[in-house]
UniProtKB/Swiss-Prot annotation:
Subcellular localization(s) per the UniProt record: Cytoplasm
Catalytic activity: thymidine + ATP = dTMP + ADP + H(+)
Keyword set, alphabetical order: ATP-binding, Cytoplasm, DNA synthesis, Kinase, Metal-binding, Nucleotide-binding, Transferase, Zinc
EC annotation from Swiss-Prot or TrEMBL: 2.7.1.21
Protein name, entry field: Thymidine kinase
KW Cytoplasm (keyword) present: yes
Superkingdom of the source species: Bacteria
Residues annotated as the enzyme's active site: 86 (proton acceptor)
One Pfam family from the record: TK
A GO cellular-component term linked to this record: cytosol
Amino acid sequence: MAQLYYRYGTMNSGKTIEILKVAYNYEEQGKGVVIMTSALDTRDGVGYVSSRIGMKRPALAIEETTDIFGYIRDLPEKPYCVLVDEAQFLKRHHVYDLARVVDELDIPVMAFGLKNDFRNELFEGSKYLLLLADKIDEIKTICQYCKKKATMVLRTQDGLPVYDGEQIQIGGNETYISVCRKHYFAPMITSNKEQNYDN
């Protein structure tokens, strides 16, 4: 039985590397996959899944009006798996489409993304994936400032923490930092060389 998986983690937890690894493993066995990502992620161009270590693959860019279910249903060859990056940016109807791909087409879907935003609120896509997914798994990484597990994303601007503003602002390491709860509320924003890992 196919299932809907949601694998979430903070920034730099290896979500995209995991997608690329899963795709490689399927394709190594001659089993085709469909890779998708949000059109909102323009860091490396629209329609690419790209990791911070330099691995990159083309992907179907999911726009507001994309009919994910119809796209997968109408493919000439049924894929063995659908992989979705930046799933936090999906809309409610996209997540319901992913559930239909699993339930009606019997194709497993693995969605990867952030759980909460810099305000510590759920993204729309994350909210519905947490509600609908058959299996939920956390991809762990450590806090930028200590040895604890990072569970939150801190937005910084001009070296200062930001707790209010627009939910979606595409950036990289210079804008967002993965932190534990303690350092979300009391960040130690310094250069990497000055970090104190004893906290």
